[in-house]
Amino acid sequence: MSYSVNFKFNPKRRLVLQAMAGAGLGAAFGGLGIGHVQAAGKKVTMGFLYVGPRDDYGYNQSHFEGKSALAKQSWIKAVDQENVPETIAVQKAMESMINLDGAQVIFPTSFGYFDPHILKIAPKYPDVMFLHCGGLYDASKHPKNVGSYFGYIDEAVYVSGIVAGHMSKTGKLGYIAAIPIPQVLRNINSFTMAARSVNPKITVQVVFTGGWSNPVKEAESANSLIDQGVDVLTCHVDSPKVVMETAEKRGIYSCGYHVDQSRLAPKGFLTGAEWSWSKVYLDYATMISKGTKIPNLIRGGFKEGLVKSSPYGKAVTAKARAHADEVRAQFMKGDFVVYQGPIKDNTGKEVIPKGKGYAQTDIWLESMDWLVEGVVGRTKG
């Protein structure tokens, strides 16, 4: 069971906090969806901040696409700002949206926006909600008008791993990642276990670039992995553009991340793990407009509509598609458990014993600090 803290939003009153056990995104949103038409309620002004450009073919673009989907709703005013660094600049940008645009809710989408920036600004504006994309919210110590939302993107990454496992001829996959934080490690491990469910001899070689956006090092890492025999590349960086283009240029397969990158690699693109923020943002807006209670902590995967897979590339075989579709269907029903023991890390240590399993909602998974068996790489040094 996950734990959520709910509060009721009213632009003319302070937020009221209620602690309660949360059943998950679907229950929290009460079945609302992107096609939902708002009933009688107040207009909503929402502000979005991105650490990079809106069209980066990656993380920032995924949020921009979610924001752009709101344009069809006349009762929502959405403002945004791109290329906002994780400095005091984000504080100024948030205050500008509140004071000049009248924003009632702010979505600071970058990991580094949370501490100290959101935590410093939120107490100054108790009638404004600050909803951070990530897993940093803690009800025991953070302001009442702060919350977080995130998707179980590793479900879609797992599906990509199945496809990669079917399509690899060398049995060597490559993963270019930014830094070894729990969410990144969870994606790497899910991808690896999925690929090895197809072929237990597969290995996944990981390179950490040390930063979310380092195109030079990303290109160097991609070429190095390909030179070592890797024939499928994927990544967890802010913009996968360089990795996808390098893989295509070198004639190998690729799996995307954040948004659909098939246009970057028309021959070698297999599939990808995508965010689906449009539903989240519309559902938040609807709840704010109606003054209904909003969970401080939101999580969801395929079943809740927060993540999706990119369409298959032309090269993907019927067998790979069928296997991936089958597992995705199990995720949709809530029947598939990725982290089911026995599982060993890549040093041979048992990290999850036989008979023990962790549901996606288990907080233990959000503190992951190990790499699974089959990964070539280290979390430190």
Per-region residue spans from a language model:
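N-terminal secretory signal peptides
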Residues: M1-G30, V37
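Extracytoplasmic "Venus flytrap"
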Residues: T45-G66, L70, V79-V90, S110-F111, ...
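Segments of small-molecule ligand-sensing domains
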Residues: K290-G381
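Flexible loop/hinge segments that line or gate small-molecule binding clefts
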Residues: P123-F150, V259-K267
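Short beta-strand elements at the ligand-binding edges of bilobed clamshell
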Residues: A139-G165, Y175-P180, P266-K279
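Structural motif
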Residues: A78-M97, G210-I226
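Periplasmic-binding protein-like
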Residues: G102-F111, L131-C133, Q228-D238, G256-Y257
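An alpha-beta-alpha
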Residues: K67, A156-V206, L297-A318
